[in-house]
Design a protein with these regions (language model features):
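Conserved N-terminal phosphate-binding loop of PLP-dependent enzymes in the Aspartate aminotransferase
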Residues: 1-217
Length: 217
């Protein structure tokens, strides 16, 4: 719907893929799951998989050409200046990272392991009434903890944090939302590595199972 509005009013559509881009949802970019065609895409984090600092904005030739005053001059292009501009280590790591994702079939693995993760989370939802909803795409999932499934009243944030602390004590890192409206940071966040195995996925949800039992009974 947003894309339709942008096209209608000749507005460029900019999509942020810093978190969900480069394979996280089982496709190269999250927007590809929804048939969207952005004009600009920002990305970071997974671009070099953390091995080098790099972030970038990618756009279409049509948009890029708007920054040129002379389209026939190959040296007439948009420039910016930054402290680390021109550092080739980041792009080199990014290219190698993307090659590994392709060569090792990590998009396919992310889709398969994401399906397993969601299946396990749904099983936990049947077991623990405190889970009000599970959602996600690929290896980018969440489990919402609620005091009441009907009203969707969130559990106290300290209880959600107690769950992640218990998981950490088991050697499993699970996130929890921390930038929502105060009182609504109650969703457990899961984003395993794209190379995750079935055993890894099961270990994550087993840890959560134990943590929920200890925190909520």
């Amino acid at each position: 719907k947003v894309q339709e509005i942008c096209r209608r009013h000749d507005v460029l559509l900019h999509i942020d893929e810093v978190v969900c881009g480069v394979g996280r949802t089982g496709t190269w970019f999250g927007y590809q799951n929804y048939g969207v065609e952005p004009d600009m895409v920002t990305m970071a984090k997974g671009v070099a998989s953390g091995y080098a600092a790099i972030a970038c904005l990618v756009t279409t030739e049509e948009v890029f050409d708007l920054f040129k005053s002379d389209a026939t001059d190959p040296m007439d292009y948009f420039r910016d200046i930054s402290t680390f501009g021109g550092c080739t280590a980041g792009p080199a790591a990014a290219l190698e990272n993307m090659a590994i994702i392709e060569e090792e079939g990590l998009l396919e693995n992310t889709t398969a392991m994401g399906a397993r993760l969601m299946e396990n989370l749904h099983a936990l939802m049947e077991k623990h009434a405190v889970i009000g909803d599970v959602r996600g795409a690929g290896l980018f999932c969440g489990a919402e903890l609620v005091a009441d499934r009907v009203s969707r009243e969130p559990v106290a944030e300290k209880l959600a944090q107690a769950v992640t602390a218990d998981c950490m004590a088991q050697g499993v890192i699970v996130g929890v939302t921390n930038r929502s409206v105060p009182g609504y940071n109650n969703t457990l966040c899961f984003s395993p590595a794209l190379i995750a195995t079935p055993d890894d996925i099961d270990a994550i949800t087993d840890a959560v199972d134990g943590a929920l039992t200890r925190v909520f009974g």
